[in-house]
Amino acid sequence: MTRTLRLGTRRSPLAMTQSGLVAAAVTAATGRAVELVEITTYGDTSQATNELISQIGGTGLWVNSLREALLREDVDFAVHSLKDLPTAEAEHLVLAAIPEREDVRDVLVARDGHKLADLPAGARIGTGSLRRAAQLRLLRPDLEIVPIRGNIDTRAGFVSSGKLDGVVLAYAGLSRLGRISEATDYFDPAEFLPAPGQGALAVECREDDTALREALAELDHRPTRAAVVAERALLATLEAGCSAPVGGYAQVHHDDEDELTLAGVVASAEPRDGAIQSVHGSLTGPTDEAARLGAELAARMLAQGAAALMTAAAVQVGDSQ
């Protein structure tokens, strides 16, 4: 009898839902049963102390415990939100599949059905992301941005309870939980860049598990992989962590899948001299050179002062602790 595969997942409702989708796809592709193994990460436990991700620092807060379970062979493979995955490769592990991406957009969940443009001045909008906070301030400097933590239930609850006027969340998370109807506004990713890898899932297994690697490869979506490779190369070359005020979005061209366009932004986390400062850039090139395109765009942005903005953001976060 073929052994049931063990899939490591975080315990949150969203993580369990995402892992369930991957488990079903693996079963459909291989005929093998998949068991979800719940694992608590540091990112999960830190929520109990209400620490902001931007203040904790470091990388891999949501993935290290899953990777350790893989290396101990407690699980056979693991599913991560790709935007949480550090850009440095993990020794003895491989990114076996990146399934087709969900919608990359950020959305607003606001009281009374408000859109971003018609929120009153001084409205309190919650987010735990420096990237979202910076871009909100670029679009609506008259809003009050409130740092928050928690899962989707907790964040949306700040609005329904009246503590906040709105929160910014990822479309993908709301959609996978069947709650996208709660969104009151949808941000154009050309104007409000998502996090690198947002909306994509990462399926990771041990490098030496050849049979499982081959099976998981059936879930891989080439255009999505090319796009996130470019975005993650941008992030890696900027030497920015997943909590930095960096946005990146690559689109494989619909009429020519051999080409993609990558856009990036680095912004100051707080106003400087009365305004948010930012560096934007974009680049088009072959999909099979996605990593080079990401590195090249990052180099251009660094030449325009992106490093100073990220350093300032780190100092501002440190001063707030």
Question: What are these language model-derived features?
Answer:
Residues 75-79, 165-166:
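Short, Asp-centered acidic motifs that coordinate Mg2+ and/or phosphate
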Residues 82-85, 91-142:
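A conserved helix-loop-strand patch within extracytoplasmic ligand-binding domains
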Residues 86-87, 176:
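Short glycine-rich, flexible loops that bind phosphorylated cofactors or substrates
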